[in-house]
Amino acid sequence: MNNMDLGYEMFCYQCEQTANGKGCTKLGVCGKTPEIANLQDLLIFQIKGISCYGKVLQNEGQHIDKNIIRFIENVLFTTLTNVNFDSKVHVELLNESQRIKENLRTITGEIHNQTSYATYDLPETKTQMLKDAQFAGIMYDKSLDPDIRSLRQTILYGLKGISAYGHQARELGYYSDEVDEFYIQALEALTDDNLTVEELIRMTMRTGEAAIEVMKKLDEANTAVYGNPAPHRVNIHMRKGPFIVVSGHDLKDLEMLLEQTKGTGVNVYTHGEMLPCHGYEGLKKYPHLVGNFGGAWQDQQKQFDDLTGCILMTTNCLMRPRESYKGRIYSTNVVGWEGVKHIGKRENGEKDFSEIIQQAIELGGYPEDQEPHEILVGFGHHSVLSDSDKIVAAVKAGKIRHFFLIGGCDGARPGRNYYTEFAKMVPKDCVILTLACGKYRFNKLDFGEVAGLPRLLDVGQCNDVYSAIRIATGLADAFGTDVNGLPLSLIVSWYEQKAVADLLALLSLGIKGIYLGPTLPAFLSPNVLQYLVDTFDLRLISNAEDDIKTCLKQNI
């Protein structure tokens, strides 16, 4: 299945919305062109080659330069769904990858693992790079065992998810040496044709362990810098005056923008996965952080269309900007789209947001206040576990029957209304935990209270799967059981590679019976999927009513 033999212009199946559930071959459903897709294949090929040399240094007991780790992390993040669509950026990264590889070659000398990844030299022109990219394609090696390919891609997509969390933590000055070393180990393993299916399954579980470690580090970074999230009411309607909408996941960018907008009269709204920022004391202390705008990422084109303010994209998910707002949207970090203004970082780590602030002022914003409407956020592990005695007592008294974690990535597929229906059908004596942008399917509904607690607890961003794990293990300890013994069901929606990292994290802990949807990943071969079903009782969602009955082991 060489994509060139089949007349494919590209091949990508890393996200949930991949064409026909099999793979994008002409244009990415995400908006990725064949040119970008092929440059990304070559970038991944290059960092695998870098890792072949890096592994030699690791085996000699040496640590890899953190600048190289940062580069690998940024490349992985750049190739994640809905992050960067700018070919110029990709060519710059490719040229840098060759410089790093050549530098490592001079340090290591000739290495034992002389794979094509290690020995390949990047040509000078983009045209030639694109010609070479076919050799880096996922389907290039027609003789490769489909289970080996499936596991390699699963590991790679897990690494992409880890890189997003690692990047966020590193922006705050936090990183894990263990995860940094693992990037090299895992990428090098993807070049090793001697590894068996069993060995790659072990590496897949290690990827899940690395995902937990990086989420733990990001939780540590966010809470050390901004405090523990605490319950907080957030206005989801607009206030009078000029404004900037901040999307993505990066708390540091939001803080810098809030600092620079102080006293300017510009209001700041979160969007998408930035909603949980309102729970952090270090961010909600700014009075001009006035609320949250809109819904999940897939609605952005419609919702940004007639905005009378500016938009800042700090991480994914970026969709093709419509002409109506292309002049009002800015990117930063690894995010990019050709023709969209990019705000870079100075050597001291600061960013200059003066242009976006000035444009927001000129646009004028909203002419009048809308009637306020509030939702509740801020239920991280620290907040929830401080009430654990109360929760345990309520469960033992029969006041709380069951917990449902309904969360993950949202997306455009019609079948995702399952998650809305599910949340609405959850019995009144059950608690719903939610996280990531999947929450927008139901987080504006009123679920009321049970046993003196809100029935809907917003745990945070996609990386706050770590918070959910802490809550689950904390409650399990209180009940003297393990997570699988809790009255807890996990109903997970996935879209991009952070969700892959999250799923692998849960599986690496031995958590069973997870419901995954709206469809299964195209990159899972039948045998790999069967292994996950047999080992972890992984289930595809069916319909909300039947799945709730199964979770509760009885009628609603």
Question: Which residue stretches match the model-derived regions?
Answer:
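Anaerobic metallocofactor- and corrinoid-dependent redox/one-carbon enzyme cores
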Residues: 2-19, 32-36, 48, 66, ...
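Long, compositionally biased, glycine/small-hydrophobic-enriched stretches that function as flexible linkers
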Residues: 2-228, 233-241, 245, 265, ...
